[in-house]
Each structure stands twice: as structure tokens, then as C-alpha cells.
């Protein structure tokens, strides 16, 4: 297939750079990535992470009330196979396209879990997943805690809802936790920064031609 050959050629070129941050996406992989950053997609409802050296794929976080949680997936689980695909032999962005799919369809996953001698075999029914990218709670001494798991389209709105809720509870200071946040939309980041920083230039992007965009 000519399209497959072309995709393989470009993937090989990017892998040859030896730069883990330079990746070629097929049309399907790009659409999957954009769906995840939109905040809504059809899949299982889990955040995945891949070790750049071993290629091992792990469950970083399972969202509440999702197919992944209902099937029994847990944070820290290791994905061994998706259907008949060895997870560690595929780039994460491509593997995700096999995990997501139409509502009501199922995906079979083989899971390794610490403390379990045998692999777990799970059939998970895909459903609509609305990603909660912000969680919050009030700590002692009127300290608010806000964790942002990724920067998607609804993140700024969710962030301000958390801020206002904590203010209503008497928040006097705040901790913003970005640990394990893989990134996302730059505009989502700058919208949040506009909410909490004084007016002025926060960040800018500039391409090789000198075209600059201020935020």
C-alpha cells in the first residue's frame, strides 16, 4: 500500500533523528491526538505513559466513571498487549489509535500488575470519555490545592471553577500541581496564566523565519 509505505518512510526519517520529541503522525494518529486534547473522545478513559528507553507502556491514571475503571484497570498497570499487538513494539501515539474506537465496541488488553503472577485479560467496552483535567481540594491552613493533569480545551474553564470553589471555602494561598502533566494546548496554558499573572507578555513562539506570536 502506497500510503503505508509513505508513512513508514517518514516515520523512519524522524526516528533517525534520534530525538524523542520529534515524531511523525499519520492522519489517524493526528486525529486521535487532537481528540484527546479536545477534552472529549471515545475510548477507555485512561492516561498512558511510555518509557522512551524500554518502550514499556504503563497506566499513569484511570479516570473515574470510565470504561477503564469499570473494567478494573489501575494506576501503575503495564499494558502488555492490545488485541494481538505487543505494546512495547509500537509508538504510544500509534498504540492509542488501536485502543480508541467507536462507542459500544470492545478492545482486548493483556495487563501485567504488580503482585499478580499471571497476566490479566480484560475486554473493555469503549464509551464517550469526558476528560477531567483539573482536580482540587482544600488543605490545612486554608491552602488550596489544584492539580492539572493536561492542558486541553476545557482546562481553563475547569481551572477557574476550581479556583472559585476554593475561594468560597476560604482559600488564602494555593498550590498548583503540574507533576506528570504531559502538556497539551499552548493556548490553554496561556489562558490560565492570564487569569493569575499581571497583564503583559507571558510567553511567545517564533518560527525559523522570525514570525513571532505573543501571548
Predicted regions and their residues:
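Extended, small/polar residue-biased N-terminal targeting/export presequences
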Residues: 1-58, 106-108, 112-122, 133
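Ca2+-coordinating acidic residues in Ca2+-binding motifs
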Residues: 4, 91-94
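Structural motif
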Residues: 76-78
Amino acid at each position: 500500500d502506497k500510503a503505508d509505505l509513505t508513512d513508514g518512510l517518514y516515520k523512519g526519517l524522524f526516528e533517525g533523528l534520534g530525538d524523542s520529541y520529534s515524531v511523525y503522525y499519520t492522519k489517524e494518529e493526528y486525529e486521535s491526538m487532537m481528540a484527546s486534547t479536545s477534552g472529549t473522545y471515545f475510548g477507555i478513559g485512561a492516561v498512558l505513559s511510555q518509557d522512551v528507553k524500554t518502550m514499556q507502556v504503563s497506566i499513569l491514571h484511570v479516570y473515574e466513571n470510565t470504561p477503564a475503571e469499570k473494567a478494573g484497570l489501575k494506576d501503575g498497570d503495564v499494558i502488555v498487549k492490545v488485541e494481538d499487538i505487543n505494546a512495547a513494539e509500537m509508538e504510544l501515539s500509534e498504540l492509542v489509535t488501536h485502543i480508541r474506537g467507536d462507542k459500544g465496541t470492545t478492545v482486548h488488553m493483556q495487563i501485567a500488575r504488580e503482585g499478580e503472577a499471571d497476566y490479566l485479560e480484560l475486554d473493555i467496552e469503549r464509551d464517550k470519555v469526558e476528560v477531567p483535567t483539573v482536580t482540587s481540594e482544600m488543605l490545612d491552613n486554608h491552602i488550596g490545592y489544584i492539580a492539572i493533569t493536561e492542558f486541553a480545551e476545557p482546562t481553563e474553564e475547569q481551572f477557574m471553577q476550581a479556583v472559585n470553589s476554593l475561594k468560597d471555602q476560604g482559600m488564602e494561598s494555593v498550590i498548583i500541581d503540574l507533576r506528570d502533566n504531559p502538556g497539551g494546548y499552548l493556548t490553554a496554558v496561556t489562558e490560565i496564566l492570564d487569569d493569575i499573572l499581571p497583564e503583559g507578555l507571558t510567553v511567545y513562539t517564533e518560527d525559523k523565519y522570525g514570525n513571532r506570536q505573543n501571548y
